[in-house]
Amino acid sequence: MMLARFLLLLCLAATASVSVAQVHRVVTLGGSVTEIVYALGEGGRVVADDESSLYPDAALRLPRVGYYRSVPLEGVVSMNPDLVLASENAGPPATLQRLSELGIATVVVSDQPSVESLYRRIEQIAGQLGVAHKGQSLTRHIRNEVAAAIAQPSRPQRAIVLVNRTGSFMAAGAGTAADAVLNLAGLDNVLSAQQGYKPVSAEGLAVLAPDLIIVTAASVHASGGLDAFRQRAGIASTPAATHKRIEVMDDLLILGIGPRVAQALQQLKKASQ
């Protein structure tokens, strides 16, 4: 599977030949991809995005072509794009390949859970839009912000990141953007031995006993509000709930590493005090 995706990336990179002067209608697939285009000041070229594109507000007013991990071919084609910018986690691969075969320039950009991947992603996107100088400027700005945020004091805390999308909790382990952000903020992920996102039960939460719980805003909403979340089985008995250390975060801030990563670090460091 990894080899197939790698070969697809090479193929798409080789076949994406649209001139930057022709890039007027862009479809973005992936919340961070969309956010970067806007951070570069090029949001006016975006004609559609996907359901993970939650920031900035302007992105919410665009037509949606589905979810970036299960992109519908027809939805993208119907927007008549001259460029598709896709996270490397977008798919299915066959859809991206088909877009390229239809003559639609489809560029897959770096999207690993690290700030270095973020910097590569910015430069790749800026290059495709013909604004490499803006990409360099944005990267420098974010590097400085991240360095300043990391230098801020924090207290080591045993933390957990929870997501509720289907009524039950999933928790972030190693290899996720959430884990990387926790580490950058000087926090210890209680599930660092776990790979990826996995379900966590009320009993499991009680045993893990995190000092700090980070939960996404959408998950709090899905749980019926913050008070209802605090009272959920397994949550109420944790040290985090006892000491009122439950931090609600913007979904993209904690679940991805995008242009506002320094803001995420600042929020987590403040929550740890």
Where are these regions (language model features)?
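Structured C-terminal subdomain patch of bacterial secreted/periplasmic proteins
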Residues: 24-25, 117-127, 136, 217-273
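Basic- and aromatic-lined ligand-binding clefts that recognize polyanionic substrates
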Residues: 25-37, 133-187
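N-terminal signal peptide c-region/cleavage motif recognized by signal peptidases
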Residues: 11, 15-16
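Bacterial N-terminal signal peptides that target proteins for export
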Residues: 1-8
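A short, structured surface patch at a secondary-structure boundary
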Residues: 25-79, 83-89, 208, 226, ...
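His/Asp/Glu-enriched short active-site or ligand-binding loop at hydrolase and phosphoryl-transfer sites
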Residues: 50, 172-197, 217, 247
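Sec/Tat signal peptide C-region and signal peptidase I cleavage site
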Residues: 17-21
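Extracytoplasmic ligand-binding site segments that recognize negatively charged/polar headgroups
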Residues: 94, 110-123, 160-177, 221-224
